[in-house]
Amino acid sequence: MSTKGRKLTVATFVLLFLLTACNQPVDTGSSNTQIMLAAYTVPKEAYQKEIIPAFQKQWKEKTGQTVTFKESYVGSGAQARAIVNGLEADVAALSLEGDIETIHKAGLITHDWKQRPHNGMITRSVVAFGVKKGNPLTIREWQDLTKPGIAVLYPSPRTSGGAMWDINAIYGAGLKMAEMETGKKDPDRGRELLSAIQKNVKVMDNSGRESMTTFEKGLGDVVVTYENELLLRNMEQPLYDVIYPKATILIENPVALVDKNVDKHGNRAVVEAFVAYLQSTEAQRAFAKYGFRPVDPTVMAETKDKFPEPEWLFDIDYLGGWATASEQIYGPQGVWTGIVEGKKGS
């Protein structure tokens, strides 16, 4: 073989070696690894200021690896669609079960994510009202949001999981109030309450975080949002009164490892450890610090004075579960769809 031929053979071998090496899983055999976290907007501070740094420290001490994070924070529904459309997230930490199921149905999550403790949930909250300090308009209950001249804010359910929780809370409150008065749920009461409040909604932003930003700019008399969004704003100084209506919904927020992306990236060990860490006592205390209700019973007991229990609290099962609620409220003939399109929903 000529010298030139030998040089080409060596060069080809080196190139093939490098390409092969670059496609090998980067896990505990390397000094560095990476996690791509795709989350809804609301827990951004908890992740960036507490949870990610604590996990990085723990993982470094355990394995010697430095783990870096790429992060994306947008509305939950938009985030789910981004993952389905090619965002290579290793972890989906979203607002609601249905958004995780969107990724699952696309074939990207292949395991039973609800088999984790707490059915795969990592935080809880409730839907509450935020009003200006001192509550100048004396807003106490959902009916107060139907009064003429009251400017209401909540985001759009087309992009925001938080908005779906808000709308579920309103519709469910109508059912609950009817049940407490008559002994039976009345869908008409739910529709009437939702329709009356929707007439007073001035802006529907893309996410719960954007709705809070709009409220902070001085637009609106009341923002319907996650309790934790309001507690976060009040951490350093009390900016808003947090109002808990008697009837409201318990919010539960899921997380799941995205199998197809993890297998492509070869980082399953560190991603599984991070997902497990989110339910640890340490992470649950961090979530509680930023206003989220813990799923861990021990941490919830430690923080119970921070989180009032609304009198007529209900969960998604009260509305028949997510599949039923999605169809009856947001489907083509759904209640909310009918209201915003100017026709009577089913």
Outline where the language-model segments fall.
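Ligand-binding pocket segment of bilobal, Venus flytrap-like solute-binding proteins
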Residues: M177-P245
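A conserved helix-loop-strand patch within extracytoplasmic ligand-binding domains
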Residues: H104-K176
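Structural recognition of the beta-strand scaffold that forms the well-ordered cores
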Residues: M36-A39, K70-S72, V91-L94, M121, ...
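Extracellular/periplasmic juxtamembrane helices and adjacent flexible linkers that interface
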Residues: V262-S346
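Periplasmic-binding protein-like
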Residues: M121-V126, G190-Q198, D205, E236-R268, ...
